């Protein structure tokens, strides 16, 4: 795959993503935190914004509506989030972190600091990976 170059970019990014998720899961496990890395974008957004609708979460994390629903069901089953109907629009579900979800965030914050430092070191090189990804995403949006 590596010799194919640009034609394999999707495969290489997927491989990198899978490795980062796997390593992230091992880090959480080493801190005795029962957490799936795929839950991170939802948990983090709710930690910052406190209450969001399903559509707002999907838009903010960049997932499709069905993928977001599936992820939310998983988190609800784990009792990390709960949902309630919006009083102004009963078709809309509002999502919040439960007490268990908030405790989880408190437990994870020191780990996020470590992960952020490590990821910054990993991507801060001659061709900054994060900047390159952001530039590519912007080009794709045009």
Go through the PLM ranges and name each one.
Residues 1-2, 125-142:
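C-terminal regulatory/oligomerization modules of transcriptional regulators
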Residues 23-31, 110-122, 135, 139:
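Generic non-transmembrane alpha-helical segments
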Residues 73-131:
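Charged, amphipathic alpha-helical coiled-coil/dimerization segments
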């Amino acid at each position: 795959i590596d010799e194919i170059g640009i034609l394999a970019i999707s495969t290489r990014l997927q491989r990198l993503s899978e490795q980062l998720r796997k390593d992230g899961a091992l880090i959480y496990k080493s801190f005795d935190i029962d957490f799936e890395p795929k839950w991170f974008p939802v948990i983090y957004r709710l930690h910052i914004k406190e209450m969001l609708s399903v559509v707002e979460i999907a838009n903010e994390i960049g997932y499709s509506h069905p993928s977001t629903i599936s992820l939310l069901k998983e988190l609800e089953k784990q009792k990390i989030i709960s949902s309630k109907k919006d009083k102004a629009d009963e078709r809309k579900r509002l999502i919040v972190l439960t007490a268990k979800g908030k405790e989880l965030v408190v437990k994870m914050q020191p780990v996020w600091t470590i992960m952020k430092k490590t990821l910054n070191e990993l991507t801060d090189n001659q061709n900054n990976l994060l900047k390159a990804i952001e530039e590519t995403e912007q080009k794709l949006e045009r």
